[in-house]
Amino acid sequence: MEKTIAINAGSSSLKFQLYDMPSERVITAGIVERIGLKDSIFTITVDGEKIKEIIDIPDHEIAVQMLLEKLINHKVIGSYDEITGIGHRVVHGGERFPESVYIDDQVIKDIEALSELAPLHNPANVTGIKAFRKILPDVVSVAVFDTAFHQTMPPASYLYSLPYSYYEDYGIRKYGFHGTSHKYVSERAAELLGRPVEELRLLTCHLGNGASIAAIEGGKSMDTSMGFTPLAGVSMGTRSGNIDPALIPFIMEKTGKTAEQVLDVLNKESGMLGVSGISSDLRDLEDEAAKGNDRAELALQVFVDRIHKYIGSYAARMNGVDAIIFTAGIGENSSYIREKVLRGLEFMGVYWDPALNQVRGEERFLNYPHSPVKVIIIPTNEELMIARDVETIKNNR
């Protein structure tokens, strides 16, 4: 049996999911947390049972060694030879990587060179890649980029109205993120609608602590709300989303903060947390709003307002919409936010059933049968998309 492992390496974590391919059955999944810190945590699910250990794991290489040993110890695999493919999530591929690629030394250098565009993520992603290559050097390794799916955006979508030389010299442009998720749900929507994705105009709403909207026409990303960084677009858990750029020097002058400190506020202290003053967790805000907390209610209203702006804009851009997709933590689980987003979209042919909306984390159509625009909840599955890309590249080598 051939097995593919999907990896998401963070600076102090390593998430993994092992698939039997090509059946796409999940064999096991888990996470290594607090790598390089005291009391690291290793969690793995075997036969439905979650097993948790606290153990010191000084670096990613040790984490990979331990992960592979645990797969053997728990009889998930008989030997390392059963693993025939490894897929690595990489946050930023820039313009260099419009699709997933086989990893060789040059690809690693290119990903490292792109680290200035994603300083928090790409170095960690590379650390994970190197750790696996050292221990399983002969296994096909594939890099799957968050930005790749959005590389089909036309220049009018991705260029900023800045001196063109900034784009040529520094690569300043919109890149977009959550691409693997947007791609997965758009393909799944086509399956559920029984139509080729090439015929469809889709609005995909990836709503989690980080959130982005995408306009997908003919199976290709035409525009997306995040920009040069994941800070742009809609209001999020702790991120501001779009603001007037002149606010940055204004805030610096008023507060005495440096540009870096202001950026930190925009990334970590803004969004729903900033407006509410309570929490970045939507569940907390829904609870507080239900108790009559005006600021919690306002934070939710701002979130929905920004989503509406993109839905209207992208519907106009594609000259109509065939389906609106909700995915990720909030999109899949919050009937409250879905209701707020869908109310007022009747003008564009969205007719949805409030009774069908009372669901969490379940794949489901929410629209009435006569609705010209379909509304679907599709739980995202980025790990499966990674495993599929590994399988494709492995089979084409």
From Swiss-Prot:
<comment type="subunit">
    <text>Homodimer.</text>
</comment>
<keyword id="KW-0067">ATP-binding</keyword>
<keyword id="KW-0479">Metal-binding</keyword>
<dbReference type="GO" id="GO:0008776">
    <property type="term" value="F:acetate kinase activity"/>
</dbReference>
<feature type="site" description="Transition state stabilizer">
    <location>
        <position position="239"/>
    </location>
</feature>
<dbReference type="Pfam" id="PF00871">
    <property type="entry name" value="Acetate_kinase"/>
</dbReference>
<feature type="binding site">
    <location>
        <position position="89"/>
    </location>
    <ligand>
        <name>substrate</name>
    </ligand>
</feature>
<comment type="pathway">
    <text>Metabolic intermediate biosynthesis; acetyl-CoA biosynthesis; acetyl-CoA from acetate: step 1/2.</text>
</comment>
<dbReference type="GO" id="GO:0006083">
    <property type="term" value="P:acetate metabolic process"/>
</dbReference>
<feature type="site" description="Transition state stabilizer">
    <location>
        <position position="178"/>
    </location>
</feature>
<feature type="binding site">
    <location>
        <position position="8"/>
    </location>
    <ligand>
        <name>Mg(2+)</name>
    </ligand>
</feature>
<dbReference type="InterPro" id="IPR043129">
    <property type="entry name" value="ATPase_NBD"/>
</dbReference>
<keyword id="KW-0808">Transferase</keyword>
<protein>
    <recommendedName>
        <fullName>Acetate kinase 1</fullName>
        <ecNumber>2.7.2.1</ecNumber>
    </recommendedName>
</protein>
<feature type="binding site">
    <location>
        <begin position="281"/>
        <end position="283"/>
    </location>
    <ligand>
        <name>ATP</name>
    </ligand>
</feature>
<dbReference type="GO" id="GO:0005524">
    <property type="term" value="F:ATP binding"/>
</dbReference>
<dbReference type="InterPro" id="IPR023865">
    <property type="entry name" value="Aliphatic_acid_kinase_CS"/>
</dbReference>
<keyword id="KW-0963">Cytoplasm</keyword>
<keyword id="KW-0418">Kinase</keyword>
<keyword id="KW-0547">Nucleotide-binding</keyword>
<comment type="similarity">
    <text>Belongs to the acetokinase family.</text>
</comment>
<feature type="binding site">
    <location>
        <position position="15"/>
    </location>
    <ligand>
        <name>ATP</name>
    </ligand>
</feature>
<dbReference type="GO" id="GO:0000287">
    <property type="term" value="F:magnesium ion binding"/>
</dbReference>
<feature type="binding site">
    <location>
        <begin position="329"/>
        <end position="333"/>
    </location>
    <ligand>
        <name>ATP</name>
    </ligand>
</feature>
<feature type="active site" description="Proton donor/acceptor">
    <location>
        <position position="146"/>
    </location>
</feature>
<dbReference type="InterPro" id="IPR004372">
    <property type="entry name" value="Ac/propionate_kinase"/>
</dbReference>
<feature type="binding site">
    <location>
        <position position="382"/>
    </location>
    <ligand>
        <name>Mg(2+)</name>
    </ligand>
</feature>
<comment type="function">
    <text>Catalyzes the formation of acetyl phosphate from acetate and ATP. Can also catalyze the reverse reaction.</text>
</comment>
<feature type="binding site">
    <location>
        <begin position="206"/>
        <end position="210"/>
    </location>
    <ligand>
        <name>ATP</name>
    </ligand>
</feature>
<dbReference type="InterPro" id="IPR000890">
    <property type="entry name" value="Aliphatic_acid_kin_short-chain"/>
</dbReference>
<keyword id="KW-0460">Magnesium</keyword>
<dbReference type="GO" id="GO:0006085">
    <property type="term" value="P:acetyl-CoA biosynthetic process"/>
</dbReference>
<dbReference type="GO" id="GO:0005737">
    <property type="term" value="C:cytoplasm"/>
</dbReference>
